[in-house]
Amino acid sequence: MTNILEKIIQTKRETLDLIKKNNSLATLEAKIKNLNFFYNFKDAIQNNKGISLISEIKKASPSAGLLVKNFNHLNIAKMYIDNKATCLSVLTEEKYFLGKLDYILDIKNNFKIP
């Protein structure tokens, strides 16, 4: 592997292989069945009358390290929404970006924004 992107991809492939090994398709389908509402990212951007802004929620990056010391994804989401973000991009990759998949569900349960 020659660069960080290749390392991230390889790590994610390994993680997905473990998830597939430990969860049947039926189990995964049952988990997403309960997610009964979705916000359309594309429509939000296309239908926005002003400037569309995609705001990123990211605790760390492989190149810069820890970006936000007292990271609170819900507070960051609220700040972005209060400042007219059209959509939120939430990094969930754990090893390199220190994200968590739960961030998306938490934000989805608290705010109405793609």
PLM regions: where:
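An N-cap/entry alpha-helix motif that binds or orients negatively charged groups
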Residues: 2-68
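Alpha/beta enzyme core
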Residues: 69-91, 110
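Glycine-rich, proline-tolerant flexible connector loops at the mouths of alpha/beta enzymes
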Residues: 26-33, 62-68, 87-107
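Alpha-helix-loop-beta-strand connector modules within alpha/beta enzyme cores
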Residues: 38-43, 47-49, 99-114
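Active-site phosphate/pyrophosphate-handling residues
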Residues: 3, 75, 102
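Alpha-helical segments flanking ligand/cofactor-binding loops in enzyme cores
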Residues: 6, 77-78, 105
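Hydrophobic faces of well-ordered beta-strands that scaffold small-molecule active sites
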Residues: 53-57, 88-90, 113
